[in-house]
């Protein structure tokens, strides 16, 4: 018997099985439970006892219980799908939410999760114990319950994973007199018929849900639809915005999803720290993004977006949640597109295909100051052209829909558990308290929460096991964040992934806003799962091309590292993902958004490395290191939050 086997057997004899409570059976909870259940096959530990507690009667979370008619995903199936369970090829790139719920149900079947999911079970309270945590829960009336006061039960466990979701506690902004009008939170709207017949509908907010609901309203039997916003919005199409040329050449209706089109090589992978931490990277992408929009639609604010432009310092993609639903945009633009001769010529030569709205429009207005006793709206003064029509009318809405988001709050946690702002390890747990993990509570500026939740789950489970089984885990999973690595993994360093604070708004502080590609890559570096160029080169052209020219798909980080799944990950990289990455998105997009940034950052990277090499030759090693890296740690969770 080898020495390693002897050590493993000795460690195994001292191990005690651990119990973990997963709160929530949405995408984040399911993928967390899956990795907890798979830990034995990867690390040789004892089976982990996992229980998933879900308040509703099925899995899916927000995608099943807080959706509306015609809702569909704003992230593509290529990015959204978990690394080892892919969406069938015959389904559309952007899944209707019903299909995504079926996907999650299939995930439960594939990884044998149904037996550990307890539906219709609400978490009442979670408290600390001497050795871990105690979860108090209550099952819905009619279900078999234990004999206890009010049907309340409890379960002691070693760790908890809070996966209750971002969209859990509705937030409705205070407006004086709102009680004088009928109003609903967006989570209460399910279908067009709720808008009524010959009614005036007001939508508060301009996020993705607001856009979808405004579209439902304007295509319903409502008489009037008004959309109110505070500071504007930045619309970004889900697919590459290819224009119609000379009103003759029309692009293929099936276009490349934007979230698959980011070349990660020299964007995250192998970009020197000095460049990655500088403002240059964001500045280039901000300008190329806006240039692409202008070329294809005549306005930098968004593709054919003539209302709601964000003004001042905030108008930068490094500080925004981009709105990826553009269904309402044609109706918002109605009557607002410029009609001067230059604009007409430009639109004739090249423009996004315009949808026929049959004259129906959505009015825009500033955020209401108040609602009078009779229900009429009091607006602030505004000189903006887009607000003229709404402010010239007496607006008396029959229904106000507050698409104003949700609050990050965990009322079931006792005092002593961290607040959202205190999760100072990648927004997942509070340092020194790894037994309480929070999965799925970061929000990307453009991207998707489920794939980030998968990477968070991988990192959290890995560190939980290191905490519980330090000897056993030392044999199986080197700690990349402490400099332990292997030749196939890129050495650990710190990425700048936080959205920036601009114009008095800080989405990183208030909503844990991150840049998808950078945050995903940081988690991969933390685990030692980011493969090197030399490793990818050995996997063949298709895998190398997908790694370099595609986004940071989670499957990319299953090729090496503690959760290595090379046998399954390589075919996905060479097949499904290669097939979408190889699409150029059209010459204008490829040149503007991919080729030019790649050439720029490639040239700067070569220059920095050449300069650093010369400095090393003359014995100035410290100066050489400073040439490539700033030595500064970017803004992190817990920094002045």
What role is predicted for each listed range?
Residues 74-77, 431:
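Generic alpha-helical secondary structure signal
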Residues 498-500:
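Hydrophobic membrane-spanning alpha-helices of multi-pass integral membrane proteins
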Residues 2-70, 86-491, 502-641:
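Flavin (primarily FAD) cofactor-binding/catalytic cores of flavoenzymes
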């Amino acid at each position: 018997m080898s020495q390693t086997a002897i050590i493993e057997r000795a460690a195994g004899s001292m191990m005690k099985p651990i119990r973990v409570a997963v709160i929530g059976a949405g995408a984040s909870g399911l993928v967390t439970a899956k990795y907890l259940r798979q830990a034995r096959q990867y690390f040789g530990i004892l089976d982990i006892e996992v229980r998933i507690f879900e308040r509703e009667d099925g899995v899916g979370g927000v995608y099943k219980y807080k959706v509306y008619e015609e809702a569909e995903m704003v992230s593509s199936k290529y990015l959204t799908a978990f690394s080892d369970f892919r969406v069938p090829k015959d389904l559309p790139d952007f899944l209707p939410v019903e299909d995504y719920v079926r996907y999650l149900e299939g995930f439960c079947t594939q990884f044998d999760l149904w037996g550990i999911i307890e539906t219709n079970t609400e978490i009442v309270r979670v408290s600390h114990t001497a050795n871990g945590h105690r979860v108090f829960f209550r099952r819905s009336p009619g279900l078999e319950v234990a004999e206890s006061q009010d049907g309340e039960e409890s379960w002691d466990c070693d760790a908890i994973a809070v996966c209750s979701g971002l969209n859990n506690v509705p937030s409705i902004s205070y407006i004086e007199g709102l009680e004088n009008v009928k109003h609903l939170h967006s989570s209460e709207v399910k279908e067009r018929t709720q808008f009524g017949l010959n009614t005036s509908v007001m939508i508060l907010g301009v996020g993705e849900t607001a856009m979808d609901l405004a579209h439902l309203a304007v295509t319903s039997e409502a008489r009037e639809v008004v959309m109110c916003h505070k500071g504007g919005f930045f619309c970004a199409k889900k697919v590459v915005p290819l224009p119609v040329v000379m009103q003759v050449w029309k692009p293929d209706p099936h276009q490349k999803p934007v979230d698959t089109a980011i070349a990660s090589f020299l964007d995250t992978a192998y970009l020197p720290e000095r460049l990655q931490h500088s403002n240059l990277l964001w500045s280039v992408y901000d300008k190329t993004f806006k240039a692409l929009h202008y070329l294809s639609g005549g306005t930098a604010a968004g593709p054919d977006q003539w209302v709601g432009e964000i003004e001042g310092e905030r108008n930068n993609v490094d500080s925004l949640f981009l709105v990826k639903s553009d269904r309402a945009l044609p109706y918002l633009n109605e009557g607002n597109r410029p009609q001067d001769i230059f604009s007409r010529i430009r639109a004739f030569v090249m423009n996004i295909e315009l949808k026929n709205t049959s004259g129906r429009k959505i009015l825009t207005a500033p955020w209401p100051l108040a609602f009078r006793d009779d229900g009429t709206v009091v607006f602030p003064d505004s000189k903006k052209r887009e607000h003229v029509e709404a402010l010239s009318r007496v607006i008396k809405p029959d229904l106000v829909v507050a698409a104003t988001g949700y609050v990050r709050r965990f009322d079931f946690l006792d005092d002593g558990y961290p607040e959202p702002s205190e999760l100072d390890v990648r927004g997942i747990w509070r340092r020194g308290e790894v037994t309480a993990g929070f999965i799925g509570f970061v929000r990307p500026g453009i991207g998707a929460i489920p794939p980030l939740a998968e990477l968070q789950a991988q990192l959290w489970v890995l560190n939980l096991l290191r905490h519980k089984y330090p000897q056993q885990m030392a044999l199986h999973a080197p700690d990349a964040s402490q400099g332990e690595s292997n030749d196939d993994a890129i050495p650990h360093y710190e990425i700048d992934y936080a959205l920036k604070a601009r114009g008095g708004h800080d989405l990183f502080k208030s909503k844990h806003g991150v840049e998808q590609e950078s945050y995903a890559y940081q988690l991969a570096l933390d685990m030692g799962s980011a493969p090197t160029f030399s490793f990818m080169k050995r996997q063949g052209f298709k895998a190398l091309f997908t790694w370099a020219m595609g986004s940071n798909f989670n499957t990319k980080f299953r090729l090496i590292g503690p959760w290595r799944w090379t046998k399954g990950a390589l075919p996905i990289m060479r097949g499904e993902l290669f097939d979408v990455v190889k699409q150029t998105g059209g010459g204008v997009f490829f040149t503007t958004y991919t080729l030019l940034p790649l050439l720029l950052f490639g040239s700067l990277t070569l220059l920095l490395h050449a300069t650093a090499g010369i400095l090393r030759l003359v014995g100035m090693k410290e100066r050489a290191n400073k040439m490539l890296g700033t030595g500064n740690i970017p803004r992190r969770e817990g920094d002045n939050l």
